[in-house]
Amino acid sequence: MSKLRLKIGIISLSFMSMSALVVTNAYSAIIADFPNEPIAKIQMIGTIPSLGSLITTLFVGVLAMKCPKKILALFGILLTAIGGLVPIFFHSSINLLLGFALILGIGIGFMNTLSPMLLSEYFEGEERAGLMGIGTAITSLGSVVMMLGGGLLGASNWQNTYYIFLITILIFLLVLINLPMDKIIQKRRLIKRASPP
């Protein structure tokens, strides 16, 4: 696999890093649709993903030693898609939206944790530092695209804001095609061989 494809596969994970903020575009419309719900509770839709991401960081490192990072990355993107797209169809209560926001945060947590891990695994020195800089730029670009796109889509109906998460399909395909599969079994064998008798 070429280095360019590998870089694309890893860097693309950074695009969704700030995507949980998309729903903040729709706060006023959601508040109007749920007048009996506390405003603070509605605002949690944009903040609870951070809790999901925090939870994820606690165990992704352990999972990465037992499961290929590519599988974990694809799983994270899938969770992000579920948390971001299902609310288009199921949005009858704030509790539902909060649940999907938590799932969204967990998915984002997978991607945010795995991206630097993969860069450290496949690249070294100045090349790694340069790619981390590019990753930061992609994160900023993704934030702008997601916020702007979500705002435009949700102009007439706040539920349409979530359509911006269709971008996860593209990210999923980029990772699926360009990121190599980790050989976890081989790593275990090497560790076993290196162990003293």
Residue ranges: model-predicted function:
Residues I55-I94:
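Conserved MFS/SLC helix-loop-helix module at the cytosolic interface between two early adjacent transmembrane helices
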